Amino acid sequence: MTKDKIAKDSYRKLLYFFENKIWVHFKDFDKIFYNGLIIDLNEDKMTMVIQERVRGEFPFLLECVNPDSIAKFNEGGN
């Protein structure tokens, strides 16, 4: 899968969480996971910024997000 295709798939899946202000859980391709609220999602630049409770704000290139790992964050593993 190309980086452009990965970025577009990630954007499409993350848009729902961004528009509805739902906490999201995802992993990058190094299998590091992130949980947070998306505070910025840019389709032109294919970037996003999430706000995590503990670590603060993180910028991401959407090509680095594994689109298959994107899901609603369930606090406490429920």
Region spans (language model):
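Beta-strand residues in well-ordered beta-sheet regions across diverse protein folds
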Residues: 49-51
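Short glycine-rich, low-complexity segments
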Residues: 1-35, 53-78
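Short, conserved beta-turn/loop elements at beta-strand boundaries and strand-helix junctions
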Residues: 41-47, 75
